[in-house]
Amino acid sequence: MATNYIFVTGGVVSSLGKGIAAASLAAILEARGLNVTIMKLDPYINVDPGTMSPTQHGEVFVTQDGAETDLDLGHYERFIRTKMTKRNNFTTGKIYSEVLRKERRGDYLGATIQVIPHITNEIKDRVIAGAQGHDVVIVEVGGTVGDIESLPFLEALRQLAVQVGREHTLFMHLTLVPYIPTAGEVKTKPTQHSVKELLSIGIQPDVLICRSDRMIPPNERAKIALFCNVAERAVISLKDVNSIYQIPALLKSQGLDDFVCERFRLTCPEADLTEWEQVLYKQANPVGEVTIGMVGKYTELPDAYKSVNEALKHAGLTNRLSVSIKYIDSQDVETKGVEVLKGVDGILVPGGFGYRGVEGKIRTAQYARENKIPYLGICLGMQIALIEYARNVAGLTKANSSEFDKDCEQPVVALITEWQDAEGNTEVRTDESDLGGTMRLGAQQCHLVSGSRARELYGKETIEERHRHRYEVNNTLLPQIEKAGLKVTGLSADKKLVEIIEVPNHPWFVACQFHPEFTSTPRDGHPLFAGFVKAAYENHKKSVK
C-alpha cells in the first residue's frame, strides 16, 4: 500500500495545539489498525533543541535512538505505539547544515545552491525517508503560516503533494475561532485570512480544525466551509477540554477519521477507543489525591519538565489517584530553607544542567532522606542524592560533582569523558569543543540487582531506559559510599556504571541516572513513577491521621 501523507499546519496564533491534534488523529487511525507515524518539522535555525534553553523551548525529548528532539515527539509517543527516531524531527538548521555539507563535498557539481530546489528537495527527501514502512505519516510544521521561517517547509510540502499525488495527501490546518463576548458570537474572519495566506503559497487545506473555548455552531461551520472552500464535514470543532486524552474521542465523534480514510480510499475497521475510555474513566474517578513537590531550576516554565509532569499523571492513573504538582525553585530552598518543602507527600528532583540551585537540591535530598519522605531522583536528581549521602553519611564532607566544581577534592560524580570506552579509548574535550553531541544519549540496557526495590517494581532483571547526561558516578569513591549503606541497585550493560541507587531503611528513596519519564504513557504508566506515587499516597495517609 502506498504511504499517505497528512500535513498539519497552524494559523492565526501559535500554541494552538497542533502536536496534540496530530497525535490524537494518529491515535484514532492507529485504533483502526493502520501503521502510523508522526514527524515534526521545526523552522528554527538551531540544528536541534539539545543546547536550547528549557525556559525558552521547553524540554528536550530524547528518542530511543538518542536524538534530542522537540517536546511534541513526547506527545506523539504518549498517544501512539510507534516509537519516534531521529528521522521524526528535523530543523531548518539541520537542513541547511546538510545542504552546505553536500555543497562543500561537491555533490551539486558546482550548481548555484538555492532554497528552491536544493533546500526544498532536502526537506522532501527527509519526509519520504521518515515515512518508509508506514501506512500514514502525519507531518506537523512548526510555527504559524505567514511566518517567513516556515516558507521553505510549506513550499516543500506543496511540491511533495504533487510528487506523490493529491490522492495520497491531505492538508489539515488548525486555526483560532475566537469568541467575542461583546458580540456574543464566535468570529470566523481570522480563519478566513489564515486560509487566504495558505492559498497564496499554493496550498488548499482539505480539513480545518477550529480551536475555540466552545463548540463552533453549525451555521458558523457552514460559513467557514463556504468561504474557505472546504467540505462542511471537514470543518472540525476542537474546543478546550479538561484533559488532552479526551481529544481522540472528540475528533472521532465528528467523523474526522472517516473523512481521512475515505480521502485515502482506505478500508479499515472502526476505531476501538476502549483503552482511551479507560484512561478517561480513571482520570475522572480517583480514589485519593497526592501532592508531589518538584524541585528544579526551570520551574517558571512547566513545559521544561513536560514528560515528568505527564509521567506523574500517568502514575496517578495507574494508582487511581489525582496528582497535584507543586513546583519549587531549588534556589528558594537555598534562600528560604526547607520550610518550602513542607506539605508535600513526595519529592521529585528532575534532570538539569549547571550549578545554579544545586545546593538547594542537595538540601532537598537530605530533607527527604532524614524525614522519610518518598523521593524520586532523575539524572541530576540521582547525582545530587549521591553527593548528599556522601557528604552527610559517608564522611566525604567535600563531595561534589566536577560539573559544579572542577577542582573539588572528592568528585563523587565526574565527567563522562573521563571514562574509557569498550576499546579503552578516552575522549578528549577542550573549552573549544562543541556542547552538542557530547552526552550519553538514547536507550541503553540496565541490570537490576536481585532483591532491590527497582527489581521488584520492574519485575524483571534487565531493562532498557533512555539517557541524556555527560557525568557519571565516580567508581573510585563509590566503595566508601556503599560501605556507609547506600545501595547500588542498577548497573549499565557492562556493569561498570551506576544507573540506580536506593537508600536503605527508608520508605521509598530511589534515584536513577536515566530518564524514565520518556517511556511513560497514559495507557502504560512507568514502574518507577507508579511506585513513587503509591509511596507518596501511603505517606499522605499517615500525615492526615
Swiss-Prot record:
It catalyses: UTP + L-glutamine + ATP + H2O = CTP + L-glutamate + ADP + phosphate + 2 H(+); L-glutamine + H2O = L-glutamate + NH4(+); UTP + NH4(+) + ATP = CTP + ADP + phosphate + 2 H(+). Its EC number is 6.3.4.2. UTP binds at residues 14, 187-192, 223. SUPFAM superfamilies: Class I glutamine amidotransferase-like (SSF52317), P-loop containing nucleoside triphosphate hydrolases (SSF52540). Residues 291-542 form the Glutamine amidotransferase type-1 domain. Pathway: Pyrimidine metabolism; CTP biosynthesis via de novo pathway; CTP from UDP: step 2/2. Allosterically activated by GTP, when glutamine is the substrate; GTP has no effect on the reaction when ammonia is the substrate. The allosteric effector GTP functions by stabilizing the protein conformation that binds the tetrahedral intermediate(s) formed during glutamine hydrolysis. Inhibited by the product CTP, via allosteric rather than competitive inhibition. ATP binds at residues 15-20, 72, 239-241. One of its GO terms (molecular function) is CTP synthase activity. CTPSs have evolved a hybrid strategy for distinguishing between UTP and CTP. The overlapping regions of the product feedback inhibitory and substrate sites recognize a common feature in both compounds, the triphosphate moiety. To differentiate isosteric substrate and product pyrimidine rings, an additional pocket far from the expected kinase/ligase catalytic site, specifically recognizes the cytosine and ribose portions of the product inhibitor. Homotetramer. HAMAP family: PyrG (MF_01227). Catalyzes the ATP-dependent amination of UTP to CTP with either L-glutamine or ammonia as the source of nitrogen. Regulates intracellular CTP levels through interactions with the four ribonucleotide triphosphates. This is CTP synthase. It comes from Haemophilus influenzae (strain PittEE). The gene is pyrG.
